[in-house]
Amino acid sequence: MKLLFAIIQNDDKKALTRALIEHDISVTQISSSGGFLRGGNTTLMIGVPKEKLDVALETIKEHSSRRKIVTANATGIPHNVDSVSIPMSVTVGGATVFILEVEDFFRC
């Protein structure tokens, strides 16, 4: 059994969660944030048997779109009164997936 932690954009969570459930893959959503854009993320905790790992990863790829946004402070440097914001186009989205081996689990 594998445990996946998939960090995705909030915009992708509804479609991805629905698609995983359609493949009979259980999902737990955890709200998270981070990255230099400080945008809202969702971390999905997904437990899958080894034989469904490829299906889970392909589903995550299909439903975690990359897109460009324009941000005023893409550098991550805090603004101060004297600073000037320069709009920059930044690619966001996609997924970061951590795959862990599950030694054992049980349900109560």
Predicted regions and their residues:
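Positively charged, small/polar-rich N-terminal and surface patches that mediate targeting and assembly
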Residues: M1-C108
